[in-house]
Amino acid sequence: MKDELFNAVRVTPSTKIRFKCTGCAECCRHVKESVPVNSLDVFYLTKYLRDTGLDICCTDEFLAQFATIALLDDCGYFVYFLKSVGEDDSCIFLNENRCSVQPAKPMACRLYPFMVDTNGSGGFRYLYSREREHHFCGPVVETRSWMKKYFQQEARAFMQADFADTVPIARLLRSIPEHGKNEALFHFHRLRYSEYNLDRPFLEQFLQNQKQLLIILGRMAEKTT
């Protein structure tokens, strides 16, 4: 999906395009370190796999088996991507040209061929990619309708909160000296990805964890001043 990002075109909610999923699974191949899984994705993927019989009980187990870590900024801020397998770097969940976690697939996959970013003022901006031209045929799709179907309220609230805290968290991480960085990143992972009860609603846990993370990092940063 890296190519999709570089070839993205800005669209408005009223923009209409032609799109049809052909079942070719090309969007699931050549995706090494290209399919991000945010806290929301990790929660629901773990829950889905657990509830469908996989011997997995927590998000840490999911991340160890199915995700790879990537540094986003030299302050230590990191993210996760789904692992890829095989010579063609297929998504680890691609099975016989079908997604094996379809009901819980990541936000990036649900929204394809569209992408969502925040606009800096509490709203969203939308993009789409024409990287795979053969997808852009068939019925007309309106951005607004697509987002209403695939970018629902919980995902919107999560993304707004997540993006709002990204810069403050990165700033705090940057202010913590090297001798405290490992502890800071431990809390970063624990509260953003690990400390979740799969049987409780996600969003309230995420918001509580983010608040706690900012408090902890703030206290650690204050010790250096």
Task: Explain the meaning of each model-derived region.
Residues 1-225:
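Short loop/turn segments that flank or connect secondary-structure elements
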